[in-house]
């Protein structure tokens, strides 16, 4: 019979809290500009930890920022999953809803979406975050005949490019109707995947689950 892991002692809790604080600080820097040139001292000060604590957790800034991106992408992917898995089953609707939820999350989860804006393109084929979830939905859609027969990774690349364009549009043109832009781009993506035009338009505008925190 499996047993639960023993509770962390005080030292282990403090160590875990320090690591989380460093990752949180790195995420803030990434969200602000995408720049990774901040000094270790600046990161430690933002995290409110001692300079020497940094090297107890990370060998370099690169390792820290990689961990921060992975942490943000995992949280982003989980947020999408929480609102769609078990609620939406149609692969086409999952793809469309993912686009539209991302646009909404620019308001409800701005830090996550800003990190996606600055760092998402290089992680389109990552094994972390939203990429494996999107690939899962594409593969299901192709296997079921919902989407046209195509190479799933190529389809994922095309979808990722459109999603990143939507994110950039959301921040660079706040005057535009983000909901409408997301629905339009979701519709075009579904058509690209082989969904008939009229159906793509309808699917891309179905009611969405509510995002926590809205």
Locate the predicted segments by residue:
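C-terminal peripheral helix-coil segments that are non-catalytic and often amphipathic
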Residues: 1-6, 136-144, 172-214
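Residues at secondary-structure transition points
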Residues: 9-13, 17, 59, 63, ...
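Generic hydrophobic, amphipathic alpha-helix propensity
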Residues: 14-26, 43, 68-76, 134
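Helix-turn-helix
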Residues: 21, 29-63, 67
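Short, hydrophobic secondary-structure boundary micro-motifs
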Residues: 39, 113-117, 150, 198-203
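Hydrophobic alpha-helical connector segments
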Residues: 63, 67, 74, 78-114, ...
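Amphipathic alpha-helical packing segments from all-alpha helical-bundle domains
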Residues: 74-81, 96-97, 101, 119-168, ...
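Secondary-structure edge/capping motif, primarily at the C-terminal ends of alpha-helices
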Residues: 83-87, 116, 166, 170-173
């Amino acid at each position: 019979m499996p047993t639960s892991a023993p509770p962390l002692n005080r030292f282990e809790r403090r160590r875990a809290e320090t690591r989380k604080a460093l990752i949180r600080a790195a995420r803030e820097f990434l969200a602000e500009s995408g720049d990774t040139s901040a000094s270790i001292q600046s990161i430690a000060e933002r995290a409110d930890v001692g300079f020497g604590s940094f090297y107890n957790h990370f060998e370099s800034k690169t390792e820290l920022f990689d961990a921060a991106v992975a942490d943000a992408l995992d949280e982003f992917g989980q947020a999408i999953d929480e609102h769609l898995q078990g609620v939406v089953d149609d692969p086409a609707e999952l793809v469309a809803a993912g686009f539209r939820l991302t646009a909404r999350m620019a308001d409800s989860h701005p830090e996550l979406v800003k990190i996606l804006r600055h760092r998402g393109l290089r992680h389109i084929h990552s094994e972390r975050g939203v990429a494996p979830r999107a690939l899962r939905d594409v593969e299901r859609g192709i296997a079921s005949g919902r989407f046209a027969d195509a190479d799933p990774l190529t389809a994922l690349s095309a979808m990722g490019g459109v999603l990143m364009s939507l994110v950039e549009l959301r921040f660079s043109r706040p005057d535009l109707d983000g909901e409408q832009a997301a629905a339009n781009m979701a519709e075009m993506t579904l058509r690209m995947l082989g969904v008939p035009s009229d159906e793509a338009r309808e699917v891309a505008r179905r009611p969405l689950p509510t995002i926590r925190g809205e």
